[in-house]
Each structure stands twice: as C-alpha cells, then as structure tokens.
Amino acid sequence: MVDMDRISISLPTNLLAEFDDIIAERGYASRSEAIRDSIRDYLIKHKWIHSLEGSRAGTISIIYDHHSTDVMEKLTTIQHDYEKIIVATIHMHLDHDHCMEVVLVRGDASNIKELTDKLTSQKGVKQVKLTVMVPGGNIPQ
C-alpha cells in the first residue's frame, strides 16, 4: 500500500464547486483521487517545461485580475527584465476584471522557462500557459 499524507487546503467556493462538477462528470470515486490526478498532471507539465533545452520560439499566455494589487506593474517590470527574449506582446480585456496578455518569445529555453516561472508566481495571475516550438524549420518530416 502507498503511504498517504493528509493535507488541508483552502479554495474559493466557486472553484471548488466547479471542480466538484468535474469530479462527478468524470466519475471519480472521491475528491482526493481527483486532486491526486490533478497534481500528477501538474507534475508532468512542470517536468516537460523544465526539460526544454536549446533555442525556442513560442508564446506565454497570461490571464490575470487587473484589480489585484500592483499585478500589472509587476508583470510589466518582469517583462522589461527579459526584453532580450520578448519579441512582442498583445493585451486584451476579457471582462471588467480580467485581462489577457500574450507574450511572444524567442531565445534560449532556460530563459523562457525562467520568465514563465516568474510570471506564474505573481499574485493576481490566474493562469499561465507556455507553448513552445523549435525555430528555424527544424521540424522532422
């Protein structure tokens, strides 16, 4: 039998309600099993991102609550710190509270990963998605 640790987490009510709907839809035996599955997916994504090497081009998509204290200023400051790999940014208003930025990047994968991690860790950032490709047409036939 696998050793188990019991943990406690705090979640916004609406986030938990949406998660519970997915649990029911997918037929999980328990909330714990669904959380374990979600953590596994997160670990796989993290390992994939951190295994990238070499020159890459891609996008970092960010959704954030623009009312969150200083989030826009912090995101801008971070982006200025990585001006050598940022090619362009696109800003879009999603609704009254949320904005989306798409940051086009090109450079060494380690710098892209570092930028993604810094953006992800900011308070007020709701979601970050990194998509990368190998530049220069080095795509297998």
UniProtKB/Swiss-Prot annotation:
Cofactor (UniProt): Ni(2+)
Coiled coil: none
Gene source species: Methanococcus vannielii (strain ATCC 35089 / DSM 1224 / JCM 13029 / OCM 148 / SB)
Single GO MF annotation: DNA binding
Alphabetical keyword list: DNA-binding, Metal-binding, Nickel, Transcription, Transcription regulation
GO biological process, one term: response to nickel cation
Its biological purpose: Transcriptional regulator.
Protein name: Putative nickel-responsive regulator
Record text on cofactor binding: Binds 1 nickel ion per subunit.
Matches recorded under InterPro entries: Acetolactate_synth/TF_NikR_C, ACT-like_dom_sf, Arc_rbn_hlx_hlx, CopG, CopG/NikR_regulator, Ni_resp_reg_NikR, Ribbon_hlx_hlx, TF_NikR_Ni-bd_C
Amino-acid positions noted as binding Ni(2+) in the UniProt annotation, renumbered to this chain: 80, 91, 93, 99
Family designation: Belongs to the transcriptional regulatory CopG/NikR family.
CDD domains with a match to the protein in the record: RHH_NikR_HicB-like
